[in-house]
Amino acid sequence: VRQTIPGFSLIWIGMAHDYFFWTADADTVRRRMPGIREVLGRWLQQVQVDGSISGMGGWNYLDWLPEWHGGIPPEGVDGGGASFSFMLQLALRQAAELEKHLGEPEMSALFERRANELRIATTRLYWNESRGLFADDRAHTSYSEHAQSLAILSRAAAGIELEQVARGLLAGKGLYRTTIYFTHYLFEAYRMIGGIGQLIHRLELWRQLGERGLKTTIEAPEPSRSDCHAWASHPLYHYFATILGIRPSAPGFQSVEIAPQLGAMKWANGTLPHPRGEIAVEVRQEDDRLCAVVSLPAGSDGVFKFAGTVTPVRAGRQEISVPSRTRRMHSTTRA
C-alpha cells in the first residue's frame, strides 16, 4: 500500500539541518540541497492567496492523538491548519540557514522572506488575542501543544505573543497534548521558555515503559503494538542537549554551547561523542551556586551559559562555578 506523509518531508529538512551542525560531514548535506529546495517548492505551491495551505495530498498525519482521526489535526486533511504552516516556516528557516552556510545567500534570503510572509498570514488566520494562543483551525475551535510549540520553534511567536504563548504552553490548560514522538518538539519549546520542570514531569511516560515490561520505546499510547520506534527515544537526546545543555553553536560542531537546565535535579553528568573526540560535562547544584566540570576535545572551544552568565570554555578539562538564580526565559542561538 502506497503511503505518503507530506509532513515528514519537512521533518527531513530538520534532520539535514541537525546533521549539518552535529557532524563534520557538510558534503552529505550539500548534495541534498536540490532535494530540500524541491520539497519546499512543492509545499509553497500549496499556499493559497490568504496564506493558508491547502491541496497537499497524501496522509497528513501529525500525531497519534485519540481525538484526531488518523492522527490528522483540525483542518489538516489536505495539509492545512496552523501546525503544518508553522512546520513549513520552521523548515524554511532551517533551509535558509543551510543555504547561508553553504554559500547561497540569495536562496537563504528567499527562504527567510517566504517564512516571514507565512508568519504574517498565520498570525492573521490563527492567532486568538483573547486566549493568547494560536488556534489549530481558522474557526478557532481547537488549541494544541503542537501549534504553540511549533509557533515558538519557527519564530512565528515573537514579542508579547511569545510571552503569551509561553505562559499558555507552560500552564497547559485547554490544549490537546502531544503524544510520544511529537513531544520532542514540545521539549524543544520548553527548553526555550524555561519549562524544564514540565519537561522532567512529562518524562514520566517513558519511566513507565519498564513497568509495562517494555525494553524499547513505543510509537503511540496504548492500545499499541508498535513497540519499537526510534523517534520515541528522543529523551536520550534531551538528556544531553537540554538537561546537560550540550549543543553545537557552529556547523560541524566546530564550537559548542553548554547551557544546562537541571530544574529540581541536584546533579547530572554525561559524555557525548564529538567529531574530534568526546565532550564530558558534570553539573551540580551546591547551595547558591552551580558547579561544573567540562572537558572538550582538542581543537574545540565554546561557551558555558547559566543564569545570565557566559563563561568561555576551551579544549581540555576546566572547572566552573557560577551563581545560581531562577530565570523565566531561556534564550537560544538556534531553534
What is the meaning of each model-derived region?
Residues 12-28, 87-105, 149-159, 185-194, ...:
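Well-ordered alpha-helical scaffold segments within catalytic/enzyme domains
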Residues 1, 32-52, 113-133, 157-177, ...:
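Long, well-ordered core segments of solenoidal/helical folds
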Residues 1-9, 67-87, 130-148, 154, ...:
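Solvent-exposed loop and edge beta-strand segments that line ligand/cofactor-binding
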Residues 3, 10, 45-55, 124-135, ...:
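Charged/polar, low-hydrophobicity segments characteristic of intrinsically disordered regions
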Residues 7, 22-84, 102-148, 253, ...:
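Active-site acid/base region of carbohydrate-active enzymes
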Residues 11-14, 31-38, 83-97, 110-117, ...:
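Generic recognition of stable, solvent-exposed alpha-helical segments in well-folded globular domains
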Residues 113, 120, 197-335:
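Non-catalytic C-terminal accessory modules of carbohydrate-active enzymes
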Residues 166-172, 190, 294, 303-306:
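Alpha-helix C-terminal capping segments
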